[in-house]
Amino acid sequence: MFSLQDLCRKHLFILPDVFGEHVLQRLGLYWRCHGSLQRIGDDHILIRRDLILSTNEALRMAGEEGNNEVVKLLLLWKGNLHYAVIGALQGDQYDLIHKYENQIGDFHFILPLIQDANTFEKCHALERFCGVSCLLKHATKYNMLPILQKYQEELSMRAYLHETLFELACLWQRYDVLKWIEQTMHVYDLKIMFNIAISKRDLTMYSLGYIFLFDRGNTEATLLTQHLEKTAAKGLLHFVLETLKYGGNIDTVLTQAVKYNHRKLLDYFLRQLPRKHIEKLLLLAVQEKASKKTLNLLLSHLNYSVKRIKKLLRYVIEYESTLVIKILLKKRVNLIDAMLEKMVRYFSATKVRTIMDELSISPERVIKMAIQKMRTDIVIHTSYVWEDDLERLTRLKNMVYTIKYEHGKKMLIKVMHGIYKNLLYGEREKVMFHLAKLYVAQNAATQFRDICKDCYKLDVARFKPRFKQLILDCLEIVTKNLAIVSWKS
């Protein structure tokens, strides 16, 4: 519980002019050898009505003098007890520290506030169960190089601490400590330094690591390649450039940049590359299914003109990566026909169907190309895009008249007849008369005989007129065809 006097002191911001030294002393608002104390806001005080100090700096001074009364007052004014402890350590006022020991708890929390190495070590010594190793770790953490230098001899006898402190210095980015450890003690492996520098995007530490390596005369090609792969995979341009100062292959960088879609990295190097090299990167981008922006960047450096069309199409089909074709189509570079020709010739019906869907190519276009290449499997598989069998037959029937080659027409008619034979008998009745006339017109005798057998099985009473008309129509078609053949000969 606060006394009434404490409540007054805590909330009194303006001292009346009539308050003399005696009254101020009785109120506890007087600091011996300094003068009156007055609170200003939450974090400053006024001494003798003319000197402004931060509350924490005043606490440090009071702690150094061992003046507990002033310390208690400043703590009422929201001061930080840690500064009183720092001051007490500087003035060797251990009695004051012991009064607040229970409130402080862990003295490690005070260490970040200390600038002086001697005070730092004194503060750490207050932690009874901590030894030299703990002190050195905290000295590394808070960049207290003088403490490390003081214990250099002891450090030299504890080899295991070298690596530990070096790693901690990397984690906390203490460059002076890193330099000192490298100069005075042997750290076998610098990999941890590079890994942390990359993960923290710390170019200063990364560059320092290469200085250490260079001083050791160790810049192995494998190490440079590893660093280029890591930094390029993360798109760290400045790290890549730093590594390349010491060697390494730019192809490693470009491969990673394409693979992970780092356009800033790519753009920096593309301007320096010959066209052939960029075309190779485009093929890699297709293989890795790179993003639209990455493909556009590579194509823009080629002015959207690709000379190695055959190889590009092979990659597009092999890796089922059609985005580059879509981009070129928008730029009015039409590679669909060339790609279809390769695709239908070399790849499975399933893969052809997948690419057809991706590029929104019409089924008729694919089927016509498949007919040219005599790929019956692709014709059949592609025709399944029309789920209704009767629609499939209608679509294929319409295509027969657009095909120029006799072998192509025969193949398509065979496919159509196969579809017809798989129809239910009731559905066959709907198309058999139309197909029979088509077969006659296209001189498909085998299919015509087969369909006539089906016609004989029909109910004579119902279908006799239609069958009679079919015979007449077929005779007319044959007559016309014979006349055309005679005229041509």
Swiss-Prot record:
Keywords from the UniProt entry: Late protein
Pfam families with a match to the protein in the record: DUF249 (PF03158)
Domain of life: Viruses
Induction profile: Expressed in the late phase of the viral replicative cycle.
Function: Plays a role in virus cell tropism, and may be required for efficient virus replication in macrophages.
Family, as annotated: Belongs to the asfivirus MGF 505 family.
Record-given protein name: Protein MGF 505-2R
Originating organism: African swine fever virus (strain Badajoz 1971 Vero-adapted)
Upper classification of the organism: Viruses, Varidnaviria, Bamfordvirae, Nucleocytoviricota, Pokkesviricetes
